[in-house]
């Protein structure tokens, strides 16, 4: 696999990771779970995924 | 290249990075105008309508640059205003030693996620990583430095050894005990550690075999001095430049290092701009972009900062674009001369602290018995940076304890305790400030050991 296709595949996986992390944060904010520490950690993970996507660069 | 940090950006065509950055700048200006109170106020005051901006050329023509005075004018008396914005996780202040007030930088979770990325480029390019220990010596308080250093180490997989609170002897001991591969220091502090190590008979090249990298920041330094440091420490010099305004490192030396060549042919190395993170302009006094080899003011726009971006912020630093056509590392990032970034105003770095003489003026001349003073910044016989004040009083019998009172007042104002000597009335007959041209205090002389061969 050349580096371009490896990078394209990585960007695809990170996109799925971002979608999943955002979904987790939405689910965690359900007040019946009542775990602000979990919500806060997911917010931090989402911010880090945004930074990760910036460093990966545009597709 | 080897020792890279992110091949995609390091080898991207310069035109592609530029296109990416210019597009993002327009987005940032629009968002800042909508969401950041300072820019709403500032752009309204300059009648700027960001919706009219279509290209970077439009922005360069119409978007006003920002200075510290603008930020302080907005923040005046409302230090905590930024903290009440939603999503704020930290607040970083500038050092506050200018006498002009402190800039306030609220940070959100996106800022914290980005805080260590620039520094990690610097460390990885300097050959650190993989659990290497790095001795940190730069002092910090409510400034960005503390979280920045920790985040940079974490992102580069470097283990920080926190030497802020150690004295110089303790720091030399920490280099040995922790088997540090790297040392982060200002040039002046490295000079101090060198004098102490020489006095102790320490030979780092053999006694500290793990040490291979020294990352300098905060001050310019001479080529001959740098060469001497590399020889003595048996380590390669590197440099990183950044500020609270840039959310960490924006320029860093590549694996080639801060000095290139050998023997008498040693020249300054290259700082590379992290152009996908910070947009860099170098503006000559006439406002035009500086060309290769030319100096100008560093003007930055942050592309990653979220809660408080800096847009066309005039840093007050004078920088030289690399006169060479390329760097041996082969990276496409913009290039600047290492070791020669210096202040345009009167600011002096002393022991890692930003000191504006005007702030010392206020502290010393506040006493009615003081008529004038002169200050000398110098490197003492033990390599320590000292500030000596000669203070002239109106009376031949000054108040008791005046030296102590002045030491305390200066320490409170700028964080440095000076040596104080009282001199009799009429000692100083020369004018304290220049009569014409840009204001430059003449009360101060700087005679440091590390900056002897500054280019003009």
Feature names for model-found ranges:
Chain B
Residues 1-93, 99-114, 125, 286, ...:
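Nucleotide 5′-phosphate-binding alpha/beta core
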Residues 2, 6-7, 66-233, 238, ...:
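Active-site phosphate/ATP/adenylate-binding loop shared across adenylate-forming ligases
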Residues 133-136, 299, 390:
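Short, well-ordered beta-strand segments
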Residues 160, 237, 280, 373-375, ...:
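Generic structural signal for residues in well-ordered beta-strands
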Residues 209, 273-277, 343:
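Short, solvent-exposed loop/turn segments at the edges of secondary structure
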Residues 221-326:
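Conserved AMP-binding/adenylate-forming
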């Amino acid at each position: 696999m050349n580096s371009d296709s490896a990078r394209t595949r990585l960007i695809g996986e990170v996109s799925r990771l971002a979608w999943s992390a955002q979904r987790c944060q939405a689910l965690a904010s359900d007040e019946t779970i009542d775990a602000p520490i979990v919500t806060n950690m997911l917010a931090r993970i989402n911010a880090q995924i945004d930074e990760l996507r910036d460093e990966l660069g545009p597709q | 290249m080897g020792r890279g940090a992110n091949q995609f950006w390091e080898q991207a065509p310069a035109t592609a990075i530029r296109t990416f950055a210019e597009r993002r700048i327009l987005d940032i200006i629009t968002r800042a105008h909508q969401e950041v109170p300072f820019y709403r106020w500032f752009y309204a005051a300059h009648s700027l309508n960001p919706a009219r901006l279509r290209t970077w050329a439009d922005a360069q023509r119409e978007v006003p640059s920002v200075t510290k005075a603008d930020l302080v004018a907005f923040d005046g008396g409302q230090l905590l205003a930024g903290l009440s914005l939603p999503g704020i996780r930290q607040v970083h202040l500038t050092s506050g030693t200018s006498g002009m007030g402190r800039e306030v930088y609220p940070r959100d979770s996106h800022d914290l996620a980005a805080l260590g990325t620039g520094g990690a480029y610097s460390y990885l390019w300097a050959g650190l990583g993989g659990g290497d220990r790095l001795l940190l010596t730069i002092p910090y308080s409510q400034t960005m430095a503390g979280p920045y250093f920790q985040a940079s180490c974490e992102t580069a997989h470097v283990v920080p050894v926190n030497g802020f609170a150690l004295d110089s002897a303790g720091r030399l001991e920490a280099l040995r005990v922790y088997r540090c591969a790297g040392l982060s220091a200002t040039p002046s502090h490295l000079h101090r550690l060198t004098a102490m190590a020489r006095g102790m008979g320490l030979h780092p090249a053999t006694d500290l075999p793990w040490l291979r990298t020294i990352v300098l920041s905060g001050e310019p330094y001479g080529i001959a001095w740098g060469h001497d440091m590399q020889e003595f420490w048996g380590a390669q010099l590197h440099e990183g430049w950044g500020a609270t305004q840039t959310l960490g490192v924006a320029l860093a030396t590549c694996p080639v290092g801060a000095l290139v060549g050998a023997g008498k042919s040693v020249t300054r190395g290259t700082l590379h701009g992290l152009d996908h993170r910070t947009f860099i302009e170098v503006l000559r006094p006439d406002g035009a972009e500086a060309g290769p080899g030319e100096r100008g003011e560093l003007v930055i726009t942050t592309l990653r900062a979220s809660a408080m971006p800096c847009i066309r912020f005039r840093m007050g630093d004078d920088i030289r674009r690399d006169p060479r056509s390329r760097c041996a590392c082969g990276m496409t990032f913009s290039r600047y001369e290492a070791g020669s970034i210096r202040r345009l105003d009167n600011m002096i770095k002393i022991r890692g602290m930003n000191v504006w003489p005007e702030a010392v003026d206020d502290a010393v001349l506040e006493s009615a018995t003081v008529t004038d003073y002169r200050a000398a910044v110098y490197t003492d016989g033990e390599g320590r940076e000292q500030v000596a004040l000669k203070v002239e009083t109106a009376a031949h019998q000054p108040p008791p304890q005046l030296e102590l009172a002045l030491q305390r007042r200066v320490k409170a104002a700028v964080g440095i305790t000076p040596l104080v000597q009282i001199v009799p009335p009429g000692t100083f007959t020369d004018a304290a400030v220049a009569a014409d041209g840009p204001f430059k205090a003449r009360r101060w002389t700087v005679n440091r050991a590390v900056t002897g061969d500054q280019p003009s």
